[in-house]
Amino acid sequence: MSQEILEKVRSIVAEQLSVDAAEVKPESNFQNDLGADSLDTVELVMALEEAFDIEIPDEAAEGIATVGDAVSYIQEKKG
């Protein structure tokens, strides 16, 4: 897992969900651990798309449940 991508995702998640970045770990589930609702999740995906200049299709977004999932997906897209 790329530390650089993880740190950027951690920062974005903390800002979007108004949580302490220290709480944002690779295994953190957006809904169960970080309190995101469905609207938060959509906004988070949009923020990640913008920050990393990628497109995350709805079907892919549905499979991203944790911070680690997001990092892995972004790593894969960025090659």
Swiss-Prot record:
Record-stated family: Belongs to the acyl carrier protein (ACP) family.
On modification after translation, the UniProt record reads: 4'-phosphopantetheine is transferred from CoA to a specific serine of apo-ACP by AcpS. This modification is essential for activity because fatty acids are bound in thioester linkage to the sulfhydryl of the prosthetic group.
Which residues belong to any copy of the Carrier domain?
Answer: 3-78
Q: Which UniProt keywords are present, listed alphabetically?
A: Cytoplasm, Fatty acid biosynthesis, Fatty acid metabolism, Lipid biosynthesis, Lipid metabolism, Phosphopantetheine, Phosphoprotein
Q: Which residues carry this modification: O-(pantetheine 4'-phosphoryl)serine?
A: S38
Say which domain of life the source belongs to: Bacteria
Q: Which GO terms describe its cellular component?
A: cytosol; membrane
Protein's name in the database: Acyl carrier protein
Query: From the UniProt record, which GO molecular function terms apply?
Result: acyl binding; acyl carrier activity; phosphopantetheine binding
One biological process term from GO is: lipid A biosynthetic process
Instruction: Tell me where it mainly resides.
Output: cytoplasm
Cite the InterPro entries for this sequence. ACP, ACP-like_sf, PKS_PP-bd, PP-bd_ACP, Ppantetheine_attach_site
Cellular compartments annotated: Cytoplasm
Native source species:
Synechococcus sp. (strain RCC307)
Pathway(s) where this gene product acts: Lipid metabolism; fatty acid biosynthesis
Per the entry, what this protein does is:
Carrier of the growing fatty acid chain in fatty acid biosynthesis.
Whichever gene encodes this chain, its name is: acpP
